[in-house]
């Protein structure tokens, strides 16, 4: 999906617009996903819609948007880096391997590199979002700024990067699955003969890519949420620390299926969300191209 003649700032801006569009549309499902992932042992919720209903009934509809500021602040640079760095890495690796076009293997490689890159931006915002979404922490923080201030004051500035390794694996795996599948799906679809057809193909490819990436990355997301919700205390070794040992701990104590807690709301968000991302990103790129043509003919 590289756009060889599109400047980096344009792909960066297109990714930012795509990210904000996706989070504003589907954020409540992220709240539900986090609540389900943080329930240890027997869940407090009997599925996605039961969780939604209980949050609205017991805490009010506004709780479905609690903690949305960090994702909004995060989504612009995160999605911008996702698409812009994916394009940049695609050009780099095609040059290294002397290929004109990308292949599924190269798409997986470039997606993984893009996922690693965006992790550096994501972690502090993810940590604050998780703390604000967790019902057990709800009374500790009075909004995003208060959450940031208390974490830095009580746990020190580096605490904002708790869970970096687990977050890195989540993003590397999700991006590898997402970008690796998109090209394959689009090549198998009937070529679009109109703008509507192009949007349809992007929506289908992006949605399938989002579902596949979510299936691969959910265990790391569960671990990341567990790591980030608990403040670090000096002298105490946390129960969940590194990703792979934590995966084994959760699977042993709660069963393998516990690694897929919150999968339904997550896939309901990131499946269509992957489609929205691809459609909006390519729409912004196409708008830029039309502007270039218009300016050239003026």
Swiss-Prot record:
<keyword id="KW-0472">Membrane</keyword>
<dbReference type="GO" id="GO:1990550">
    <property type="term" value="P:mitochondrial alpha-ketoglutarate transmembrane transport"/>
</dbReference>
<feature type="repeat" description="Solcar 3">
    <location>
        <begin position="197"/>
        <end position="287"/>
    </location>
</feature>
<protein>
    <recommendedName>
        <fullName>Probable mitochondrial 2-oxodicarboxylate carrier</fullName>
    </recommendedName>
</protein>
<feature type="transmembrane region" description="Helical; Name=4">
    <location>
        <begin position="159"/>
        <end position="179"/>
    </location>
</feature>
<keyword id="KW-1133">Transmembrane helix</keyword>
<keyword id="KW-0813">Transport</keyword>
<dbReference type="GO" id="GO:0005743">
    <property type="term" value="C:mitochondrial inner membrane"/>
</dbReference>
<dbReference type="InterPro" id="IPR023395">
    <property type="entry name" value="Mt_carrier_dom_sf"/>
</dbReference>
<dbReference type="GO" id="GO:0015810">
    <property type="term" value="P:aspartate transmembrane transport"/>
</dbReference>
<feature type="transmembrane region" description="Helical; Name=5">
    <location>
        <begin position="203"/>
        <end position="223"/>
    </location>
</feature>
<dbReference type="GO" id="GO:0043490">
    <property type="term" value="P:malate-aspartate shuttle"/>
</dbReference>
<dbReference type="GO" id="GO:0015139">
    <property type="term" value="F:alpha-ketoglutarate transmembrane transporter activity"/>
</dbReference>
<keyword id="KW-0999">Mitochondrion inner membrane</keyword>
<feature type="transmembrane region" description="Helical; Name=1">
    <location>
        <begin position="6"/>
        <end position="26"/>
    </location>
</feature>
<feature type="transmembrane region" description="Helical; Name=6">
    <location>
        <begin position="267"/>
        <end position="287"/>
    </location>
</feature>
<feature type="transmembrane region" description="Helical; Name=2">
    <location>
        <begin position="62"/>
        <end position="81"/>
    </location>
</feature>
<dbReference type="GO" id="GO:0015183">
    <property type="term" value="F:L-aspartate transmembrane transporter activity"/>
</dbReference>
<dbReference type="InterPro" id="IPR002067">
    <property type="entry name" value="Mit_carrier"/>
</dbReference>
<comment type="similarity">
    <text>Belongs to the mitochondrial carrier (TC 2.A.29) family.</text>
</comment>
<dbReference type="Pfam" id="PF00153">
    <property type="entry name" value="Mito_carr"/>
</dbReference>
<feature type="transmembrane region" description="Helical; Name=3">
    <location>
        <begin position="105"/>
        <end position="125"/>
    </location>
</feature>
<feature type="repeat" description="Solcar 2">
    <location>
        <begin position="102"/>
        <end position="188"/>
    </location>
</feature>
<feature type="repeat" description="Solcar 1">
    <location>
        <begin position="6"/>
        <end position="92"/>
    </location>
</feature>
<keyword id="KW-0812">Transmembrane</keyword>
<dbReference type="GO" id="GO:1990551">
    <property type="term" value="P:mitochondrial 2-oxoadipate transmembrane transport"/>
</dbReference>
<keyword id="KW-0496">Mitochondrion</keyword>
<dbReference type="GO" id="GO:0015813">
    <property type="term" value="P:L-glutamate transmembrane transport"/>
</dbReference>
<dbReference type="InterPro" id="IPR051752">
    <property type="entry name" value="Mito_2-oxodicarb_carrier"/>
</dbReference>
<comment type="function">
    <text>Transports C5-C7 oxodicarboxylates across the inner membranes of mitochondria.</text>
</comment>
<keyword id="KW-0677">Repeat</keyword>
<dbReference type="GO" id="GO:0005313">
    <property type="term" value="F:L-glutamate transmembrane transporter activity"/>
</dbReference>
<dbReference type="InterPro" id="IPR018108">
    <property type="entry name" value="Mitochondrial_sb/sol_carrier"/>
</dbReference>
